[in-house]
Amino acid sequence: MRKTNRISRMTGRALSVFCLFGLGAVAENAPSAFLMPSRMTSVPAGQVHELGGFIGERYRLNTEARLLGDLGFEYEKFLRMVEEKKTAQWCFVGEHPGKWLEAAIWSSQATGNAALRAKAEETLRRMIAAQEPDGYLGIMATSLRTPAQPLRGMDPYEQYFTLHALITAYEAWGSKPALEAAKKLADYYVNTVGPGKVEFWPKHEDRSNGCGTIAGHAAHQCLEGTLFIDPMMRLYQATGEKRYLEWTQWVVANINRWGKMNDPKLNVFDDLDLVADGKKTIGAVKGWSHSHTWHMNFLGMLRLYQATGDATLLRKVEGAMRDIMSRQVFATGAVSVHECYQTDQLLPNGSAVAETCASMSWLELNQYLLEMTANPVYADTIEKVMFNHLPAAQASDGGGFGYHTALVGTKVRQMGGQTCCQGSGHRATAELVRFFYATDKEGLYVNQFVPSTVRLKLATGTGVTLKQATGYPNDETIRIDVTPEKAERFALRVRLPSWCEKPVLTVNGKPVSDLKPGSYCALKREWKAGDVVELRLPMTPYWLKGEYNNSGLVCLKRGPLVYMVDGIWVEGGLRDLRSMEAVAVDICAAPVVEALPAGFMGPALAVPVRIVDQPAKVVKMVPFANAGRWYIDEADKEKRPDRNLYGAWLAPVGSERNAAAVSLEVARRVELPNVIDRTGPSFKDEAHNPQNGKEKPSGWSHLGYRTRHSGDWFSWDLKVLPDVPITLRVGCSGGEFGIKKFSFDVLVDGQKVGEMKVPAPEGRVDGVFALPAELTKGKDKVTVRFQAHPGKQAGRVFDLLTIKGK
């Protein structure tokens, strides 16, 4: 029986809630639901305490400002939606109570925050009270639920997190009511989705947006419903009740058939074998190869493999992972381009990349595979995301998370809002403590290096305390104090990151030989109180050369950290550049380590930098993890303007890409004094009379551009001068999802002045059109219209100017 520690700091009210809900019991492992057990078992959040360092501070902010303080997030509103059940529209907001509850359970356990614990208990009580007698626990209007329509389109995705949270409440607190609520919710799916009932094909009545009635968006085919196999199999693992296993097997057996309902050529499930064979990429298995959705389905397949021993499932998932890791992982460890996996090597820097939802499930998928296989490659990936992209997506005051976090982008003051990624960000951060340590029959694993204390038991029942003291990854040294209750022989396995070529490890000052990077160092010995392990991971900064769309660019790395040029550390800022490629770095000069103020991931690396045509000057490059911070210190916080540029991939001094970007910037200096009018994502769109054809007006859409399909159009009005030559400039960013379908005419007051074709996502395209004199004669404004070519799309416009002169 594996038990979890209970938080000792509880109020009297919290204790009464424990008694009311039967929370005093400790969850027991179900009868063995594993034919294929994991190689290691992660240590629960309740046994990991005293987090320190940068991760510890971000964890504290997430706990206090976000989960407890509700900074920038209307948590109560979403909980009331579950209680009131009035939602009719297709949307994805019903996941927030489940995401919040699970995050609050983990965080309250790790931090001992009694107020958060009480709030989590109350949330659990309200969610259980809101459950319908038939088991439904979502936000769909009760009047709309029928046997033919038991689910709203996003219910499976939203209730994925609800079911996980209920199971976590049972496993962490021993809550029998939570387990019963979990079973009722799972039984609702068993009773309503199945042979002769509804299935996970999303019938979409509104074909203009593809919103499904049963299982999410039609573009996901069935996978936005089948993802429910993950919490369903977790419930089977917790209870051993066969109906959850059998339902999951039925779902997996129908993935191919449901996928074909959208496209008869698809073999969504079987083609994963082609991915494993190297004959296909995960991005080519289906259209809209949504990363986050794949991850959740893969987790369910792995649980099903463990329960049944069906090795074909493991082969499919591991094959997909090999494909993803070979070409679709950013230097920061994150994944997803426009939320999806692509068919090629495309990893754009400045587009909509590294969705926070995808980062969350990517972390979980790597952790699950690490536990199953003990392959440290998965721990290495977690390390990259944990120290780079996840904190970069987090506002440094704890006030929110970005939807996407570009590797070359613009800083903003607020990351608030109520998107799916907001909930995923605080859930992923809260879950980090589960990734640090693990156990097996022989002993213990140290998987991640974060200042922390863990108290656990060996398979023999002997208690052991491990305490990590480290400034990693700022510093090179990790000290691990090992304190068993009594002297005992066991294995302590310490991960040696693959990036470190020459690690140094000692036990009580004595060096250990034959250390292999990218493996675990197994220290099998008799351990006693006072034993100390020290690991030193030498970090030499180096420039990583880019490939494919990053060819000709470089990225500065030190240890697991990716660095960036950050406008807040540049005198005068970087607010007016069109491209970060106009910022050139001297890769021949050795970077110099410099300290950063408290609150930053550090250290800085001082590097000579040339901005446009200015003389080179030394600039502090800082870790990418700081991308969510727009100021240097509190005194600077309010006066510092946002929208500073930053970039992790940079052009070297003297490179072709830098020379081209500098030429554009110099030309722009001449252009700017002659600009008559301009619109774009940073401007008041309404002042320019936005119009479009068949589709509803949307202004600058959520990604900063309009997209109009075959034959459709959109337009703006721009000012001109009546009797002078006028040039129209149209700035576009690369096409969406790797599909080169953006092709459209440019018309001014109905007359075609040119056309544009926008390539795949990386890069910028400028259209420059000299307007005929008769078009502007006697006018003070014109209408600029973009008309999609047949079978193509019009869009990706982010900058539109009228300029005096030719």
Where are these predicted regions, by residue range?
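Solvent-exposed beta-hairpin/edge-strand motifs
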Residues: 495-507, 746-748
